Every structure is written in structure tokens, then in C-alpha cells.
């Protein structure tokens, strides 16, 4: 077995935290300790390492790896022998396979630019509060993921007609009696040509934090679908039955009142992301020294595309169209900007809302659910114009 340090080198600078797992810091924001390869991130938890991107980094089409959020449900693998690592493909298939990293590397690769977002991004704004990591706005990022199509690997194995779901298991180190992080996706999504077994991120090998040596990439869906550190893919005759499929990562079938309990049988799996926008500049609480300013941000919509973004500078009384950036790609956020001259000095609430090509528009208030998933309320920042 290789050490963590050797693992880091083998992963092309796949950087990890060396030593015993630090104590849990809690769900709130903490002053960031020195985490190699993750400059300036907001620490939500050090127990399993959950890091959030500050909104000021949300200013480009592609998020640098050092600023890409991290969501871990368990401990990251502490050691990995690349000579022994294998990815098995089995279950409802004719020819079970075992693949090495070299075999995956030799297959035809495809690249998908994808906005990856944790289902719980925005959970901190749910009232009443709900359990879970208290993400605010930055559990989201966009990267270029490359690797073989999952469909091509499944075709090699020969999926039987009984295959309905595809299960992913990673090498997460499970503490005690905690259930393993295992999830599945419908065969239709698994065999979509854009679903990948990613081995590269932004042109380099995946880092340890982001799933080296291989991860699933399920574009347009919640981040939990794109399992990291893959070691097993299994074709099932039905949805996987496990903690992170049920009761975990499920949405109510009908809107519920804040604080209301929902039975599991009245829920469905969380899948595609909602339409959403984010104001990156000016920052919330900023003292702006000029009445003339550029409001800038990002908008994304999962499997849909962004149709428009609107901005309000009067707390939502009126809305004006923002200018969308020229760069656009399916599954990918869109940059937007709005030029504004404040009529006078004083306090202002600036808001943004996006509408996608499916006709969905961000709601004015939080659509509460017991897990705080897929919250996409219009974004707001409060500023003070001093000039």
C-alpha cells in the first residue's frame, strides 16, 4: 500500500490532509485552516471535509480546482495502491468486467463542461432550519470533466433487459456503523451519451479530493449522483435500496409547509438541478464607493438552459433584463451582467432571478422541504452606496 503522500504524487498533485481526521468543527462557517490545494475556502466541516467556495470566486466559466467545493459523506480514502485498484462492472450484465485505470485511459474519451452543485446548496436559508451541512451559496462549481462514456463501458458488459438502474460504490472510508455511500441512477440516464466515467478535471488527472482515480459524472443532476473514488458499478433490476437513496436525497411529491414531516412513500429521488442564479459582485454587505456599478453573477438550470436573467435594484418592485455572456454550453452556468447607476447614496437590496428554457423561474421565497434540498430562491445582496 502507498502512503497518503505517495497517493498524492500518483494522482498528479491529488492533495489530501495528512494525519488523523480532525475533530468536527460544526456546520457553520469557520476561519479556514491551511488545506493544501484549497486556497481561501469556507470550511463547513473538517470531519469529512466539506468546503464551500466564497461567492467572489464565482466569476468565470470554469472554476479552478483550488476553488471547487468539496462535499464528502465519509472519510476520503487514506491509501490507494494503483497497481491493485480495479473498477468492477457486474450485476444484470452478460459479461462482468474488471477495468484498470490504464484500461479506462485507453478508451475513447469525451469532455463535458458541467456545473456541479450539492443538493443542499442554500440549506442555510431554510426556515425553520433543517439538519445537514449549512451550505450558503458556494457549494457549486463548473469544470471540464473528461473520460469514457459510461454507456460505452456498459455496452462492453452487455446490459440485460432486466437492467433498470446503475449503482455506484466508491472507496469512501466508512466510520463505525455509518451506512456506506452508495447510490444508483436510472438506466436511461446512465446510458445517455453525456454521462461519463471521469478521470480528468480541467485538463488534469482528478485530485484526491475530487474522486481520483475515477468518478461518475452525471451532468445536470445533483452532485450526490456523481459518486467519487469509484470501485464498483452494478446494474440492478430496480433502484438501489440504501440510506442515501431512501430516506436520503429525496424530495416531497407535493409542496409542504415549513416544519411539516413527510413520509418516505410521499417522496421521490432528487435528480436534476433547479434553475438558479447567484450575484457574485457586489458582495453582500459591500460599501460601494461609486453610484455607477456593474452587477455580475452566474445562472444555471441543470438539464435545461438559461433563457434570461433579470435584476432588481429596488427590493423586487421592478425587474430589468441582464446581459447574458456569450459563452454557453448545455449543463453549464451562464455568466451575466447588469450596469446600474444608483439614483442616490444609501442602502439598496439587489436581487437576481433566472428563467430557464423549460419556463421555470426562481421563486421569491424559499420552497421549504425537510432536507433543505434544491433551494433556489431569488438571490439577494444588500449594499450601501457611499458616493
How would you describe each model-predicted region?
Residues 27-387:
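Structured, non-membrane catalytic/scaffold regions adjacent to prosthetic-group chemistry
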Residues 16-17, 159:
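A generic secondary-structure boundary signal that marks alpha-helix termini
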Residues 20-23:
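C-terminal segment of classical bacterial N-terminal signal peptides
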Residues 1-15:
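N-terminal secretory signal peptides and thylakoid transit peptides that target proteins
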Residues 15-16, 47:
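Residue-level detector of alpha-helical transmembrane segments in integral membrane proteins
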Residues 10, 25-26:
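Compositionally biased amphipathic helical and low-complexity segments enriched in hydrophobic
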Amino acid at each position: 500500500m502507498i502512503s497518503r503522500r505517495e497517493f498524492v504524487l500518483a494522482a498528479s498533485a491529488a492533495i489530501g490532509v495528512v494525519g488523523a481526521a480532525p475533530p468536527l468543527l460544526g456546520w457553520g462557517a469557520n476561519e479556514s485552516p491551511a488545506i493544501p490545494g484549497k486556497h481561501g475556502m469556507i470550511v463547513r466541516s473538517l470531519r469529512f471535509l466539506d468546503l464551500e467556495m466564497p461567492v467572489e470566486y464565482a466569476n468565470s466559466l470554469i472554476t479552478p480546482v483550488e476553488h471547487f467545493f468539496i462535499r464528502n459523506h465519509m472519510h476520503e480514502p487514506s491509501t490507494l495502491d494503483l497497481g491493485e485498484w480495479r473498477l468492477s462492472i457486474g450485476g444484470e450484465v452478460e459479461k462482468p468486467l474488471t477495468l484498470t485505470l490504464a484500461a479506462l485511459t485507453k478508451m475513447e474519451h469525451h469532455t463535458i463542461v458541467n456545473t456541479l452543485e450539492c443538493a443542499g446548496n442554500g440549506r442555510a436559508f431554510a426556515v425553520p432550519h433543517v439538519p445537514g451541512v449549512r451550505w450558503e451559496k458556494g457549494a457549486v462549481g463548473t469544470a471540464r470533466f473528461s473520460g469514457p462514456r459510461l454507456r460505452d463501458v456498459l455496452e462492453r458488459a452487455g446490459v440485460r433487459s432486466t437492467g433498470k438502474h446503475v449503482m455506484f460504490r466508491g472507496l469512501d472510508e466508512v466510520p463505525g456503523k455509518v451506512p456506506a455511500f452508495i447510490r444508483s441512477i436510472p438506466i436511461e440516464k446512465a446510458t445517455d451519451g453525456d454521462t461519463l466515467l471521469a478521470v480528468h478535471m480541467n485538463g488534469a488527472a482528478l485530485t484526491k479530493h475530487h474522486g481520483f482515480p475515477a468518478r461518475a459524472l452525471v451532468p445536470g443532476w445533483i452532485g450526490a449522483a456523481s459518486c467519487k473514488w469509484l470501485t464498483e458499478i452494478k446494474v440492478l433490476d430496480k433502484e438501489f435500496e440504501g440510506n442515501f437513496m431512501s430516506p436520503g436525497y429525496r424530495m416531497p411529491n407535493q409542496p409542504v409547509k415549513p416544519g411539516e414531516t413527510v413520509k418516505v412513500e410521499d417522496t421521490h429521488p432528487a435528480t436534476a438541478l433547479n434553475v438558479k442564479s447567484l450575484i457574485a459582485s457586489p458582495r453582500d454587505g459591500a460599501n460601494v464607493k461609486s453610484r455607477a456599478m456593474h452587477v455580475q453573477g452566474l445562472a444555471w438550470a441543470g438539464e435545461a438552459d438559461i433563457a434570461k436573467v433579470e435584476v432588481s435594484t429596488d427590493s423586487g418592485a421592478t425587474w430589468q433584463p441582464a446581459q447574458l455572456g456569450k459563452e454557453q454550453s448545455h449543463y453549464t452556468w451562464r455568466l451575466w451582467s447588469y450596469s446600474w447607476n444608483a439614483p442616490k447614496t444609501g442602502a439598496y437590496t439587489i436581487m437576481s432571478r433566472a428563467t430557464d428554457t423549460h419556463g421555470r423561474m426562481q421563486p421569491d421565497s424559499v420552497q421549504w422541504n425537510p432536507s433543505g434540498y434544491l433551494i433556489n430562491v431569488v438571490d439577494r445582496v444588500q449594499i450601501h452606496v457611499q458616493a
